[in-house]
């Protein structure tokens, strides 16, 4: 067994980055320890400054690239190059980005999910890979300048833009000659499907409150208009919507394909039923009703999002319920199909158990964090469901984030 050499915070060591890790880091080894390397790309040899130290592992940041990986490129994001926490994959060749992300997911599913045999991954790169973000949140410093937050810091990068964002969205908001805002507020800006830019000043919700406060509408109406297929949603700019301009259509198309040809068992003789959990404004409800001819019950915590869904989908057999998914499942009619899109923290054991007890034939589970998705996959297995399909969407190009959709079938 290799002896562990004494290290201290601030020490600089040489590490070869061997593989990617969840969270955008690279993994290497040094004298018996696993080293997590912020800014490391597989194939790099780097000097790493130790920031966190444990008995069996350490975490640090690249201070010098001594031998660059073949997949390392010049930074594609001015804001990230200036220290912003936006595009942590800005120096990774975009042609290998989705493959790196699929490796991270596979590792999480094997280690955390306990899945030995995985279905073949369906990999989808969403275009464009720059200028794809149609909504953004900016901090405002003490002098009123808006900018992008540095990683785990309140400091802002105010001089340059992030390459994720649609360029016209940031015009006059960030950089030289940009307007000034109220110090300490947050700027929310979006360009909607009608081509209208909306800019508001807001203040985050205080602890225990669900909604933030929009202090002032600076441009537009403050109510965005988003269109997918034949349906148009109108809701406050502060409400959730998919960041990538092509994501709503891409996810909807995958769900439509997963539901195509599904033979539903009508046990109660009252017609097919589907649940749309963490449903937001009901983005997926039209696809579900169209493919299954089912009554859809959507559960969403935000009253504003549910109201927007009711208005947009009036005439469809969709019922919106406002509340937490944890307390709502037992009150809904038994479903044939469940679609759920939980937050980054995942759905969790209690929610998945309550869904499984309702015995849906098919579950479509959307995840935006590979670790919590893998944890939920393990719970599906415990509750008698197995993964039938798996898709990975590079819906956040230039970052370590990605979207995963798993299709699960009941086997017991």
UniProtKB/Swiss-Prot annotation:
Active site positions: 368 (nucleophile)
Record bears the keyword Plastid: no
Keywords of this entry: Methyltransferase, S-adenosyl-L-methionine, Transferase
InterPro entries assigned to the protein according to its UniProt record, in alphabetical order: MeTrfase_TrmA_AS (IPR030390), NA-bd_OB-fold (IPR012340), SAM-dependent_MTases_sf (IPR029063), TRAM_dom (IPR002792), U5_MeTrfase_fam (IPR010280)
Domain of life: Bacteria
Membership in a protein family: Belongs to the class I-like SAM-binding methyltransferase superfamily. RNA M5U methyltransferase family.
PANTHER family, sorted: RNA M5U METHYLTRANSFERASE, TRNA (URACIL(54)-C(5))-METHYLTRANSFERASE
Protein name, per record: Uncharacterized RNA methyltransferase Cgl1903/cg2084
């Amino acid at each position: 067994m290799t002896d562990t050499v004494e290290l201290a915070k601030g020490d600089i060591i040489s590490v070869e980055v061997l593989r990617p890790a969840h969270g955008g880091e690279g993994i290497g080894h040094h004298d018996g320890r696993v080293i997590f390397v912020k800014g490391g790309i597989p194939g790099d040899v780097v000097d790493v400054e130790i920031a966190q130290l444990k008995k069996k592992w350490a975490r640090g940041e690249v201070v010098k690239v001594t031998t660059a990986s073949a997949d390392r490129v010049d930074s594609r994001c001015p804001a990230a190059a200036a220290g912003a926490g936006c595009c942590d994959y800005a120096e990774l060749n975009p042609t290998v980005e989705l493959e790196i992300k699929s490796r991270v997911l596979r590792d999480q599913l094997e280690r955390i999910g306990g899945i030995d045999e995985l279905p073949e991954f369906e990999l989808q790169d969403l275009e464009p890979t720059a200028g794809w973000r149609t909504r953004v949140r900016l901090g405002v410093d003490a002098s009123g300048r808006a900018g992008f937050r540095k990683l785990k810091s309140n400091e802002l990068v105010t001089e340059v833009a992030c390459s994720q964002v649609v360029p016209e969205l940031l015009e006059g908001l960030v950089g030289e000659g940009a307007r000034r805002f109220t110090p300490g507020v947050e700027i929310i800006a979006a360009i909607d499907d009608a081509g209208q830019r909306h800019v508001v000043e807001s203040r985050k919700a205080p602890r225990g409150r669900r909604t933030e406060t929009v202090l002032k509408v600076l441009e537009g109406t403050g109510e965005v208009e988003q269109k997918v297929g034949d349906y148009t949603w109108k809701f406050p700019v502060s409400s959730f919507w998919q960041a990538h301009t092509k994501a709503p259509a891409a996810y909807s198309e995958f769900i439509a394909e997963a539901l195509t040809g599904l033979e539903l068992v009508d046990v109660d003789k009252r017609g097919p039923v589907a649940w749309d959990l963490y449903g937001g404004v009901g983005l997926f409800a039209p696809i579900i009703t169209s493919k299954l001819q089912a009554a859809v019950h959507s559960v969403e915590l935000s009253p504003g999002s549910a109201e927007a869904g009711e208005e947009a989908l009036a005439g469809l057999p969709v019922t919106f319920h406002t509340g937490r998914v944890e307390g709502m499942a037992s009150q809904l009619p038994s479903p044939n199909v469940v679609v759920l899109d939980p937050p980054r923290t995942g759905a969790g054991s209690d929610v998945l158990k309550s869904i499984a007890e309702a015995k849906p034939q098919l579950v479509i589970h959307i995840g935006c964090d590979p670790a919590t998705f893998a944890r939920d996959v393990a719970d599906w297995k415990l509750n008698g469901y197995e993964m039938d399909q798996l898709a990975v969407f590079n819906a956040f190009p230039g970052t370590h984030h990605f979207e995963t959709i798993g299709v699960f079938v009941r086997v017991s």
